[in-house]
C-alpha cells in the first residue's frame, strides 16, 4: 500500500522544504497525488508526482445540455468545462493530455454534478442515475478519440455527496459499470465524501462505524475496482441538520458561489483520523494507494498524524 499526500500545481513545493524527497521519506510518504489544471504542468512538481487529480467542473451538465450560465470564459471552463458539449469534450481531453505528462499511476475524476443554483440546498433536482449515465457518455466520447480507445492512465472515478456516484450502496456503481465502454478505469473511494452522505455522523467514532458498515456491504467486484482511497472524514451531521437552506434566487451568481465556499467546507471537513480503528476501513477496501487528503497550511502535520496510525 502506497501512501500519498495531496498537493496542487497551483501551489509551489515550498512546504516540502529544500529536498522534497527527503521530507517525504522522513514522514512515510511515497509521493504526491497532484491536482492538475488545463495547462502544462510545472517541471518543479513532476519528479514527486505519483498520481493526478484532474480538474473538476461543478455543473458540467449545464454545458452538456446547452444551457450554460452567463459567465466569462475562464469561469465557464472551471464551472462547466466550457459552454457547449464540444467544449466539455475538448477541455476534459486537454486536462487529461496535460496530466499524462506526469506519467501517473492513475488520474482521479469527480463523478458528480450540482446545479449552481442549488449549492447551498439540502435537496438537489438531479438524480444520481442521470448524472452517472451522462458522465459515462462524456467520458466514452473523450476516450474514443484517444490511442487504442483507452485513456493514457487509469481513470479513477471519485464519489461525491452531490448527485452522481455516491457509493452509499452499489446502485450508482452498477450504472457506471454498465455504461463505461473502455477498460482502464477504477474507483477512488473518498471516505470523507461518503461520511457527508451518511446520517448521524457527529463524531470520529460515528464516522468509522458508518464507513465500516457501508464498506462491508460492498460486493467483491466493487472492492476490486477500488484502486485508491482518499482517506479523511467529516463529522458534519450537526451542521447538515442546522444550516439554512438557501437557493440562489435573485442573488448575483458570483456572490452566491463565493458564499457557498464556507458552506461546502462545513459539510466536507477533511479531518484527519486520530483513532487507530480507522485502519480497519483500509483492511476492508484493500486499495493499492491511499491519499491522505488534508487541507490547510498544516497539511503535512495532519498527514503525519494520520499516517502514524497505519502500518
Where are these regions (language model features)?
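Hydrophobic faces of well-ordered beta-strands that scaffold small-molecule active sites
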Residues: 2-9, 30-34, 47-54, 107-109, ...
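Short, well-ordered coil/turn elements that cap or connect secondary structure elements
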Residues: 26, 44-47, 148-150, 180-183, ...
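Histidine-acidic metal/acid-base catalytic patches
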Residues: 2, 89-95, 100-105, 182-189, ...
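Surface-exposed, active-site-proximal loop segments in enzymatic domains
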Residues: 60-86, 113-128, 244-248, 305
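N-terminal pre-domain/capping segments
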Residues: 1-94
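Active-site-proximal loop/turn and secondary-structure-junction residues that shape catalytic pockets
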Residues: 36-38, 56-58, 111-115, 159-163, ...
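Active-site acidic/histidine proton-transfer and metal-coordination neighborhood
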Residues: 81-186
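Short, surface-exposed basic-aromatic patches at helix termini and helix-loop junctions that form
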Residues: 23-26, 42-50, 171-181, 307-311
Amino acid at each position: 500500500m502506497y501512501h500519498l499526500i495531496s498537493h496542487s500545481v497551483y501551489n509551489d513545493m515550498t512546504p516540502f522544504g529544500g529536498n522534497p524527497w527527503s521530507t517525504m521519506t522522513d514522514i512515510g510518504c511515497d509521493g504526491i497525488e497532484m491536482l492538475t489544471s488545463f495547462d502544462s504542468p510545472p517541471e518543479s512538481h513532476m519528479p514527486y508526482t505519483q498520481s493526478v487529480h484532474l480538474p473538476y467542473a461543478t455543473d458540467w451538465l449545464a454545458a452538456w445540455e446547452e444551457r450554460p450560465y452567463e459567465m466569462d470564459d475562464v469561469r465557464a471552463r472551471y464551472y462547466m468545462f466550457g459552454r457547449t458539449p464540444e467544449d466539455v469534450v475538448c477541455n476534459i481531453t486537454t486536462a487529461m493530455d496535460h496530466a499524462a505528462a506526469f506519467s501517473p499511476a492513475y488520474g482521479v475524476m469527480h463523478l458528480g454534478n450540482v446545479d449552481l443554483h442549488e449549492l447551498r440546498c439540502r435537496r438537489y433536482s438531479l438524480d444520481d442515475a442521470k448524472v452517472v449515465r451522462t458522465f459515462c457518455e462524456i467520458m466514452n466520447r473523450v476516450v474514443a478519440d484517444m490511442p487504442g480507445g483507452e485513456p493514457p492512465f487509469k481513470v479513477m472515478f471519485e464519489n461525491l455527496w452531490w448527485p452522481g456516484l455516491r457509493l452509499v450502496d452499489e446502485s450508482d456503481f452498477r450504472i457506471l459499470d454498465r455504461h463505461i465502454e473502455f477498460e482502464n478505469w477504477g474507483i477512488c473511494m473518498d471516505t470523507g465524501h461518503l461520511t457527508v452522505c451518511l446520517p448521524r455522523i457527529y463524531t470520529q467514532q460515528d464516522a468509522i462505524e458508518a464507513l465500516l458498515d457501508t464498506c462491508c456491504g460492498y460486493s467483491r467486484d466493487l472492492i476490486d475496482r477500488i484502486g485508491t482511497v482518499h482517506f479523511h472524514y467529516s463529522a458534519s451531521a450537526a451542521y447538515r441538520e442546522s444550516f439554512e437552506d438557501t437557493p440562489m434566487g435573485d442573488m448575483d451568481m458570483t456572490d452566491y458561489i463565493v458564499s457557498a465556499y464556507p458552506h461546502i467546507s462545513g459539510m466536507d471537513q477533511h479531518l484527519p483520523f486520530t483513532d487507530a480503528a480507522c485502519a480497519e476501513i483500509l483492511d476492508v477496501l484493500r486499495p493499492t494507494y491511499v491519499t491522505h487528503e488534508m487541507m490547510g497550511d498544516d497539511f503535512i502535520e495532519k498527514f503525519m498524524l494520520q499516517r502514524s496510525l497505519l502500518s
